[in-house]
């Protein structure tokens, strides 16, 4: 079963809880139905809220490919790159990096998520508020078309073999998005579409499809490039959605 990255779910549920004046402990439970134990994170989230933060944002950086939302360099960004995700607050500059591990005896293992706190430079809020859903959507759609076109020009099907498609179907069967109510419809569509693409690409990258070495290398480069675009769209759309939740809550009723 596929789940969105923990940071995406946590950022949106934490922002929703702050906007609705709900306990942040509820946000952790709602965001992480697949996790048996959560360590850390709650005191830092509550501190951020008490110091006036209203928006929790997301970045999904990879080695060599920085998502562009966190300041480049620094221990916090490096820790996020190690695991491929983080949540952060812009004004104070705080970062939480989720690390998953299994615990318990064999046959009765549980899944624990540790939220590792880091300090970081603040992120100008105007940079984040400039994330327009229409632009994110357009860029992602263009990337999908361009990358599929490259694969077709190489006479390579984007996703090869029935076994890979079956594995994708298994991962997506009953996919748990674990997202809060009130998200902008366009943001929700981008988040779920990008999540589906990430799941499909993860599976596609596990098989060569019986291609020759040159085609395998070209295919992998193209798929990894598209994966970068999908994760960028996912992080940006989630951050834009969080900003939307906070702004909606601030409007006079």
Regions found by a protein language model. Give the residues of each.
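Glutamate identity and glutamate-enriched acidic tracts
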Residues: 3, 26, 39, 46, ...
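Arginine residue identity/basic-tract feature
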Residues: 9, 22, 44, 49, ...
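Internal, hydrophobic cores of structured domains that mediate oligomerization or house catalytic pockets
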Residues: 52-150
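Alpha-helical oligomerization segments
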Residues: 151-253
């Amino acid at each position: 079963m596929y789940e969105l990255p923990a940071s995406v779910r946590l950022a949106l549920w934490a922002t929703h809880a702050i906007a609705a004046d709900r306990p942040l402990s509820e946000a952790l439970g709602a965001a992480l139905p697949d996790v048996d134990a959560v360590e850390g994170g709650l005191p830092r989230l509550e501190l951020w809220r008490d110091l006036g933060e209203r928006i929790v944002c997301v970045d999904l950086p990879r080695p060599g490919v920085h998502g562009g939302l966190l300041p480049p360099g620094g221990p916090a960004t490096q820790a996020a790159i190690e695991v491929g995700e983080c949540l952060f607050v812009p004004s104070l500059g705080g970062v939480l990096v989720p690390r998953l591990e299994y615990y318990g005896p064999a046959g009765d293992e549980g899944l624990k998520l540790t939220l590792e706190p880091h300090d970081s430079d603040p992120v100008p809020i105007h940079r984040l508020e400039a994330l327009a859903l229409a632009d994110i959507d357009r860029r992602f759609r263009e990337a999908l078309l361009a990358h599929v076109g490259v694969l077709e020009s190489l006479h390579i099907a984007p996703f090869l073999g029935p076994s890979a498609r079956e594995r994708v179907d298994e991962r997506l069967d009953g996919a748990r998005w674990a997202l809060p109510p009130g998200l902008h419809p366009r943001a929700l569509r981008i988040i779920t579409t990008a999540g589906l693409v990430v799941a499909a690409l993860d599976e596609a990258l596990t098989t060569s499809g019986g291609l020759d070495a040159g085609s395998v290398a070209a295919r992998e480069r193209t798929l990894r490039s598209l994966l970068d675009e999908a994760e960028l769209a996912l992080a940006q759309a989630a951050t834009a959605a969080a900003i939307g939740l906070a702004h909606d809550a601030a409007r006079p009723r």
